[in-house]
Amino acid sequence: MEQYKRILLKEFDSRQKVITELTNLEAILNLPKGTELYISDIHGEFAAFDYILRSCAGILNEKIKDCFGDSLSEVHKDRLSALVSYPELVLGEETKGQDWYQETIPQLLNLLAFAGAKYSRSKVRKALPPQYAYIIEELLYSDTALADKKSYFENILTYVIELREAVPFILGLSRSIRQLLIDHLHVVGDIFDRGVGSAQVIDELQHFHSLDIQWGNHDIIWMGAFFGSKACLLNVLRIAARYGYLWDIEKDYGLNLRSLTLFADKTYQSNPKFRPILGGREQEFSEEEILQLEKVHQALSIIQFKLENQLIKRRPEFQMQDHVMLDKIDYWEESITIDDTKHALVNTCFQTINPENPSALTPEENQAVDSMLASFQSSLKMAEHMSLLMNKGSMYKIYNKHLLFHGCIPLEPSGEFQPFILNQAHYAGKELLDFFEYHIRQAAKDKEVGDDLSTDLIWYCWKGKLSPLFGKEKMTTLERYFIEDKETHKEVENSYFSYRNSEKVCQLILEEFGLFSQESRMVNGHTPVKTGKGESPIRGGGLLFVIDGGLCKAYQKKTGTAGYSLLNNSYGFQLVTHQPFQNAQKVVESPFAQTSLKKVIENVEERTLIKSTTIGQSLLAQQQELFGLLHEFYDR
């Protein structure tokens, strides 16, 4: 503590400096809080995710209308919205003349000033492109009603245009406007899954100014794979093969999958059940490439089932003996017995399975797995991306009195917290999520060891009955490949998913996490909201918001929308309903064709100030430290 005081004294070495900082903090604490955007289940759909960020989930259009009113035509406002969202595309359409720049840049400056009106000048400055910060501030705060200032403004603007800096200047202004409109981003899980653009999503998140991430079930297997879990790795690669983006991640992360493709090519034949699901990308693949993916898909699936068999036997404490599926198969008869019922197997590809020891990998399978794991773990880009997930991520987040988590809080059929029992210790509710987070961070410390308890628990997070990220009785992957009876495909949800409609249970969960404020809410992803069937994203008497982003096109027929995101500004919550995203060019041509529909859920009586937020608590603590410094050293 004494050392900390010495550091403070070095920075604030006079009474005046302490007073100045206290005054600055007080000013910041009394400003309105910034706008937060909550988004979940991106599922690798980069273009749709990028659009939500670029359009600020519909806030941009609103701000343009509020800023310019009737002074601009609707067409002009549309074009300005497109410019701020996709400046690269709009500026690249055709050569812009000096008159266009002279008209457009002042409009962008007006919009920037409007977007930053509730912030301190210091915060606005931090949002500006560093190379133009001084010029932009001069232009922002020039009173053009005065003749001299108007001339000053016009001269600077003309000089920027003549130096051919107008394009990068507009790019910078557009980014600054977007940054001021979305102050903080919450990603409530599942960056990864079916889409091809997960790497691009994380690239964008790496450069986002303020964010947090709540891990989803699909995120956790990527993390597990990087930390050394072979079972997680095979799940990651199998899903990539199934949805046709295996070669995309090979390229994105510089992976070496040659040993896998050589092994699969000579071991497996065509099997239509393993034909990749390409989701409209069929024209990008030749029949030869599709056949190769079919073979690789089979190889990855069988190796995954073997490794999972091994893991379950290695961890009897996980109580997953019923999931040792390969041991239940009669390989001569090609049938499997589940719950005393025998089922015929179809689409089989058991060439490498030894019926006497179904879990054993062949030497070639072992070589392929070791090669893939080494490649996955040695990728520099993978290391950067996993570092972001660890540094910004967690099992849950308490932020501004709200609880954010991806999957579920496991509950008993009675509605009580359901315990995970491990080595006679019970973990339930908040303790359960803390337990898994501890082990995830332990596994991250040594990625050379892939079969320790902590790393195996990451795999359990993916498909274990009491995983807060999975939330189902059982994952039926093998059944879906090889059994026609769809009854065996069913995955029974945890009781949480019915109880989350109960206000009483939602209140119980909030209190379990120490949240007793009437303002507290829960934000949950993971499950698509089937709007077409009358489901609502608002549950539990308004205490819970389910915001599965619905960006995955495969779910949009079921949901009837492209999902939801959530906004929270100083006035309260707004729910945003998204329309299916087509492409950026369509947005540029017709911005309002992609309109996001907003619903105000609740308005607070008084605007929420920074002093009432999570960041505000930190600033108040700083203020108290400075008061202590003032009284102890300067006001004695």
UniProtKB/Swiss-Prot annotation:
Reactions the enzyme catalyzes: beta-D-fructose 1,6-bisphosphate + H2O = beta-D-fructose 6-phosphate + phosphate
Domain of life (superkingdom): Bacteria
Assigned EC number: 3.1.3.11
Stored InterPro entries: FBPtase_class3, Metallo-depent_PP-like
This protein's UniProt keywords: Carbohydrate metabolism, Hydrolase, Manganese
UniProt enzyme class: hydrolase
GO biological process: gluconeogenesis
SS bond list: none
Pfam families per UniProt: FBPase_2 (PF06874)
Names of required cofactors: Mn(2+)
Coiled-coil ranges (or none): none
A GO molecular function held by the record: fructose 1,6-bisphosphate 1-phosphatase activity
Protein name: Fructose-1,6-bisphosphatase class 3
Species of the source: Streptococcus sanguinis (strain SK36)
Gene name for this UniProt entry: fbp
